[in-house]
Amino acid sequence: MSGQLERCEREWHELEGEFQELQETHRIYKQKLEELTSLQTLCSTSISKQKRHLKDLKHTLQRYKRHSSHEEAALIQQMTANIKERQNVFFDMEAYLPKKNGLYLNLVLGNVSVTLLSNQAKFAYKDEYEKFKLYLTIILLLGAVACRFVLHYRVTDEVFNFLLVWYYCTLTIRESILISNGSRIKGWWVSHHYVSTFLSGVMLTWPNGLIYQKFRNQFLAFSIFQSCVQFLQYYYQRGCLYRLRALGERNHLDLTVEGFQSWMWRGLTFLLPFLFCGHFWQLYNAVTLFELSTHEECKEWQVFVLALTFLILFLGNFLTTLKVVHAKLHKNRNKTKQP
């Protein structure tokens, strides 16, 4: 037997030994996976049972509170606060357990589990989401500038509007996945992206004509301003969130948003004038489109629908921001009054 063949035989025996070890490791892995699945089912069942009983207990306490004494009312208030805190704990627990997708994710992805089981995977996905927002914001800014000042063609406008539709659709999917994994983004700042997706889709279907050309430059200028503000928000919110996480004041899955939240009060209030300017520009867009919808040459249904959509965006953004600012000012006033 030649020396080269002997080396091949030795290598084969080494690989055979490693293969046996791999098989044993894989057997243990499957066993642990089955144990993990059983534990996940047990935890999910126990959490559902606890939540159901706590809900019943909360209703009972609310009924009893009407006829309670002062001491009993204090005890009921304490128990109610404990129940609320327990519900927050369950929310954190469920972030690490498989769960059924909501209606939107079921429509888009089907019944596929999107739960990321490790903190490392959650943070990696969250960081990738933030980078996606940053890169697309820059691309949309460049696209809006190009369409406004260089490329005066309907086809390039359609490409830009299609990019907006794809961007907002992707954001809604990624945000839904992050919410399933424990991110606390909620309320209007989630709905905002669904409304923006619809608005971009209507803009995409708006045929070229006199009315479209009357609104085109205003919309592109608004898109440029909006992208600049979103870039500023991302840049400064990211730094603010990093500091607050280091102090233990924010969750590691908190996201940058295209608006104003209470945690931004320290260090990011300088963004408020830009945000309010953007909100009122949305109102200006709505008013302009309402006026254009009454133009004798206007035959497109998109004009009136876009006017309503911009009005909804203005009301949602403006009232939500105003609510946050008012609540924070009220809280600060109460603090200064305390001795």
Curated annotation (Swiss-Prot):
Entry keyword Nucleus: yes
Signal peptide stretch: none
Induction: Up-regulated during adipocyte differentiation.
Residue ranges of coiled coil: 1-67
Swiss-Prot/TrEMBL keywords: Coiled coil, Membrane, Nucleus, Transmembrane, Transmembrane helix
Membrane association type: Multi-pass membrane protein
Gene Ontology CC: one annotated term: nuclear inner membrane
PANTHER family tied to this protein: TRANSMEMBRANE PROTEIN 120B, TRANSMEMBRANE PROTEIN INDUCED BY TUMOR NECROSIS FACTOR ALPHA
Protein task: Necessary for efficient adipogenesis. Does not show ion channel activity.
Protein name: Transmembrane protein 120B
Annotated source species: Mus musculus (Mouse)
